[in-house]
């Protein structure tokens, strides 16, 4: 469950290290985002000479949460950190590599690129 002011790790090589959620997109008063939801973020920490800079406001998709995701068979997949992948305005990933596992819930038409770049799909 990601809400406003949540700090997330960035799981790609866009140059951002950490980001803060400033808005959950999709709905007028939507409070929480789960895995696969698009959020608006601001970059809090970035590496030098990266593709993104500190203070930029971008979109991102949530790929890992501590809360996890419940499958239809009753199993729950949880992670140690909250993580996101930075997107451009066309909702395509800015980075060319994804770090760490992602879940099958991202397997929609919009995020197949993230699935194909990820080292492990749970």
Swiss-Prot record:
Keyword RNA-binding on entry: yes
Pfam families: Ribosomal_L14 (PF00238)
GO cellular component: cytosolic large ribosomal subunit
InterPro entries given in the database record: Ribosomal_uL14, Ribosomal_uL14_bac-type, Ribosomal_uL14_CS, Ribosomal_uL14_sf
SMART domains registered for this protein in UniProt: Ribosomal_L14
Keywords for this protein: Ribonucleoprotein, Ribosomal protein, RNA-binding, rRNA-binding
GO biological process, one term: translation
Gene Ontology MF annotations: large ribosomal subunit rRNA binding; structural constituent of ribosome
Family to which the UniProt record says this protein belongs: Belongs to the universal ribosomal protein uL14 family.
Subunit annotation: Part of the 50S ribosomal subunit. Forms a cluster with proteins L3 and L19. In the 70S ribosome, L14 and L19 interact and together make contacts with the 16S rRNA in bridges B5 and B8.
Function: Binds to 23S rRNA. Forms part of two intersubunit bridges in the 70S ribosome.
The protein, known as: Large ribosomal subunit protein uL14
Organism, scientific name: Buchnera aphidicola subsp. Acyrthosiphon pisum (strain APS) (Acyrthosiphon pisum symbiotic bacterium)
């Amino acid at each position: 469950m990601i809400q406003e002011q949540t700090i997330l790790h960035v799981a790609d090589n866009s140059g951002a290290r950490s980001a803060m959620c400033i808005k959950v997109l999709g709905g007028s008063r939507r409070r929480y985002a789960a895995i696969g939801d698009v959020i608006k973020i601001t970059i809090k920490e970035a590496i030098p000479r990266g593709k993104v800079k500190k203070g930029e406001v971008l979109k991102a998709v949530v790929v890992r949460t501590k809360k996890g995701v419940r499958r239809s068979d009753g199993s729950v997949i949880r992670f140690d950190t909250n993580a996101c992948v930075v997107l451009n305005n066309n909702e395509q990933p800015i980075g060319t590599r994804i770090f760490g596992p992602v879940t099958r819930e991202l397997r929609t038409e919009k995020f197949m690129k993230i699935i194909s770049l990820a080292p492990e799909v749970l």
